[in-house]
A protein has these predicted regions:
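Short active-site oxyanion
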Residues: 63-71, 87, 145
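Short hydrophobic beta-strand that contains or immediately precedes a catalytic carboxylate
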Residues: 59, 70-75, 88-91
């Protein structure tokens, strides 16, 4: 009996690395599936229509006009401080309660017929957690001339690397 027990014990011990690999693989696979699922889930807020977007080259031209739009950054503070569109207002991330509260406070005293351009640029616009909530809030407040800066990849790639003007926080 002792010999059988030692044989079974040795077999179990020998198989532990294999079992550990299987468990680890299952954990990583389920983690990867959760990650892929969360990336595939669109951010909350209203859809952005093509007519509500503005490409960087068009915004640059409009910024030179007398009646230029109000540009509002709804990205995290560190992105705004690092580099932002000249003259852009910062109202905090659109995905946070404080950011939306600050945006609402500013918007309450802003004429509803003013042209506004929102941008974030933290990530591809299709996954941005900040744009849609901010856009939804301005829509709810009655703003009709709100556009979203079209940044398919991020602010650095689609604005800075293409040579559009920037300024840094003071």
């Amino acid at each position: 009996m002792k010999i059988i027990y030692q044989g079974v014990r040795a077999g179990l011990l020998a198989s532990l690395p294999f079992v550990a690999v299987l468990l680890l693989h299952g954990t990583l696979a389920s983690s990867a599936n959760r990650s892929a699922t969360s990336q595939a889930t669109p951010p909350s807020g209203p859809e952005i229509t093509a007519s509500e977007t503005i490409p960087p080259e068009e915004l640059e031209k409009e910024m030179a006009d007398q009646a230029k739009p109000i540009v509002v950054c709804v990205a995290p503070r560190f992105l705004y401080d690092g580099a932002h569109i000249p003259g852009a207002l910062f109202h905090g991330p659109g995905s946070t309660t404080d950011g939306l509260k600050d945006l609402r406070h500013w918007a309450e005293s802003t004429p509803r017929d003013r042209a506004i351009v929102l941008y974030c640029g933290c990530c591809p616009i299709s996954r941005c957690p900040n744009i849609r909530p901010a856009l939804g809030q301005l829509r709810e407040m009655g703003f009709k001339k709100v556009k979203v800066l079209w940044l398919p990849k991020d602010f650095h790639t689609d604005w800075i690397e293409k040579g559009y003007p920037i300024e840094k926080a003071r």
